Amino acid sequence: LPTFAIPLEAAGYRTAYIGKWHMGNDDTRRPGWTRWVAMKGQGEAIDPMLNVDGERQQATGHVTDVLTDYALEFVTESGGKPFMLFLAHKALHPNFIQRDDGSTGTVAGQPEGFVPADRHRGRYASATVPRRPNAGVAPVRKPALQREIPGLPPLGTATETSDTDVRARLEMPLGVDESPGRILQLLEELGKLENTVVTL
């Protein structure tokens, strides 16, 4: 798959893809990336197993923090060379695996569902979860949503997301919000901020 990283690397940029590649479950390093840190499929929320430049490495901590740490390391190691960092966080995705056949399952030894970093867990515990008027209603006249998926109940009240899950999902991006702040702070400390384009 040709990506914009190939011409950038050819032009002398150090390039890094760090995060959730998720074009299938194959996390093999792709052409054009000087640094490759990816996970198979969805990856794990806690202590993720990563493909770091072709080697399996077990990381420690919440995946958002782990990926941000790799990004900071890459920026620091770039020294005076031009660089391009593509950071793709796993959050807001729930903690589950998607098999090659499309079926899903839980990750052994991992918490299920939406997993915020411990420091953010419970931040919205007392928040009221707003609901649309059609929440939990079967999707009448929407054939694509009425299709049967093996192993899953039809959409409706049985598949409605609980308030607890909504709150946890809202807590997950708090770590993602911190990530660019940490990167911008490092760029400023290294004197690179004014010469760096940041796109979110």
Model regions: which residues?
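A general marker of short, structured functional hotspots
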Residues: 29-32, 70, 116, 120
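Active-site-proximal cap/lid insertion segments
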Residues: 40-59, 74-81, 86-200
